[in-house]
Amino acid sequence: MPTPKKGARLGGSPSHQRKILSNLAAQLFEHGAIRTTDAKAKLLRPYAEKLITKAKSGTLADRRNVAKLIPNKEIISVLFDDIAPKVADRSGGYTRIIKLENRKGDNAPMSQISLVTEELASSEASRATRAAASKKAEEEAASEAE
């Protein structure tokens, strides 16, 4: 017997929640960023990240599984052809949630959820910048001591 999911239920019924998440994910993949309520953004993040992970493999079976959840073929092609190659080197964390001001009409907490497509900074580059910063700090400390 399936047990009910705990937590926020968007729209009342489970089928309505699935449709809401499907439409939000489609809009996120189409536009790159969307404004929505905090509750919807928090539920959309793992949903969208699982779809992006499936798109990274690029197999026909994964494309069909994503097509079951997102019925728009253009958005599926954007996901597999544009978004997945940009995040191929990432192992997760494809989305970012930024808190915004509350909505004017009903004071609902709003957020912007967006795709993270920037390149990851390599550990060697960050190590080099830290080394340069520490060397500069040592030079400043030495000049102040004199």
From Swiss-Prot:
<keyword id="KW-0689">Ribosomal protein</keyword>
<dbReference type="GO" id="GO:0022625">
    <property type="term" value="C:cytosolic large ribosomal subunit"/>
</dbReference>
<comment type="similarity">
    <text>Belongs to the bacterial ribosomal protein bL17 family.</text>
</comment>
<dbReference type="InterPro" id="IPR036373">
    <property type="entry name" value="Ribosomal_bL17_sf"/>
</dbReference>
<keyword id="KW-0687">Ribonucleoprotein</keyword>
<comment type="subunit">
    <text>Part of the 50S ribosomal subunit. Contacts protein L32.</text>
</comment>
<protein>
    <recommendedName>
        <fullName>Large ribosomal subunit protein bL17</fullName>
    </recommendedName>
</protein>
<feature type="compositionally biased region" description="Low complexity">
    <location>
        <begin position="124"/>
        <end position="134"/>
    </location>
</feature>
<feature type="region of interest" description="Disordered">
    <location>
        <begin position="124"/>
        <end position="146"/>
    </location>
</feature>
<dbReference type="Pfam" id="PF01196">
    <property type="entry name" value="Ribosomal_L17"/>
</dbReference>
<dbReference type="GO" id="GO:0003735">
    <property type="term" value="F:structural constituent of ribosome"/>
</dbReference>
<dbReference type="GO" id="GO:0006412">
    <property type="term" value="P:translation"/>
</dbReference>
<dbReference type="InterPro" id="IPR000456">
    <property type="entry name" value="Ribosomal_bL17"/>
</dbReference>
<dbReference type="InterPro" id="IPR047859">
    <property type="entry name" value="Ribosomal_bL17_CS"/>
</dbReference>
